[in-house]
Design a protein with these regions (language model features):
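...captures the hydrophobic TM-helix bundle architecture rather than a specific catalytic motif
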Residues: 1-325
């Protein structure tokens, strides 16, 4: 508990340093921007805040790993441990050494492993394949974290390693998706709010993953790297997988935590609006990228196709905002 408290309470001062520095050099902090746009202490405060966050995440990950390994029942082998615990274990191991996007997505997948059996009214299709998929994602996570950086001057060998590592995540992701679909197949499904969010999350996870497979190939990545394709892919993954899985889990556990039942009608309206808005925003951004719209801009020339698609993106964003309200 003390280590956990230390890790948690390091987050507010780190966030304060990052925000109060007002560093204006994008979230990657490329040197050109960091020198021109953020002179003075802004960049130093931003970097120091990230260092504190890094220490916090390392301490939190150590706490999770030790807790899971030491506090589980002695007669419970790792192979039989609940898949949600496996999700936390593997994401913590990845965070200790490398922090790919998988580290944020794995807990959301673990949430779905709690939701699908409950509302399909049957056990998970294959516990062992879920364990294998989490393990594989942990391994390839160490060889995929630089797949955002093909265009930054890495050697051909380095780019090849990270490309293969990223593509190796496809079988693991497919195993999770197949597991969820096979669990639902033949089950007596109760389409309550949590499983609707989980199903939507899997659909968007598959869509984002399909785009990621294409984008992980070096030839296409150099074309789409500085375009809205990357913006659409990344945020479809974050919104579609992480947020949808987490919100579904919140709905699932809300009655257990509060002793009160949520409104099924409002929950389903929340899901439908969020799903429609997400599709409108991030699928359209993929198309914008293919039409050549660059990212990191605050304005764009009056190209008719760009204008029309950005209107669609704005409509989708308002729909998401209304759904979350």
């Amino acid at each position: 508990p003390k280590l956990n408290a230390v890790a948690f309470w390091m987050i507010p001062p780190a966030g304060a340093l990052i925000w109060l520095g007002f560093a204006d050099f994008t979230w990657y902090a490329y040197p050109t921007y960091s020198v021109i746009s953020a002179p003075g202490p802004a960049a130093d405060m931003w970097i120091f805040g990230l260092k504190i966050l890094g220490v916090s995440s390392i301490l939190g990950s150590i706490n999770f790993v030790v807790t899971i390994m030491k506090c589980k029942h002695p007669d419970l082998p790792l192979s039989k441990m609940p898949l949600l615990a496996w999700a936390y274990l593997t994401s913590s191991l990845i965070t200790l050494v490398a922090v790919p996007t998988f580290a944020a997505a794995i807990p959301a997948i673990g949430f779905m492993y709690e939701i699908f059996p409950r509302f399909s009214r049957k056990p998970i299709f294959s516990h062992s394949s879920g364990v294998a998929a989490f393990t594989l994602l942990t391994i390839v996570g160490f060889a995929s974290w630089a797949h955002h950086m093909y265009a930054t001057g890495m050697s051909f060998t380095e780019k090849t390693v990270f490309m293969v590592g990223t593509l190796a995540a496809v079988p693991a992701s497919a195993m999770h998706t197949f597991n969820f679909l096979a669990t639902m197949w033949g089950g007596r499904i109760k389409f309550a709010t949590p499983i609707m969010w989980a199903v939507g999350g899997i659909a968007l996870f598959f869509s984002a993953g399909a785009g990621g497979v294409v984008n992980s190939a070096m030839p296409l990545d150099f074309i789409t790297h500085d375009s809205y394709w990357v913006v659409g892919h990344f945020h479809l993954f974050v919104m579609g997988t992480i947020l949808f899985g987490t919100v579904g889990f919140v709905y699932y556990f809300f009655p257990y935590v509060t002793g009160r039942m949520y409104s099924e009608v409002l929950g389903k309206v929340h899901f439908i609006l969020s799903f429609v808005g997400t599709v409108l925003v991030f699928f359209t951004q993929h198309i914008l990228g293919l039409f050549g719209m660059p990212r990191r801009i605050y304005d764009y020339p009056p190209i008719p196709e760009w204008i029309q698609m950005n209107i669609i993106v704005s409509i989708g964003a308002f729909i998401i905002g209304i759904s979350m309200a």
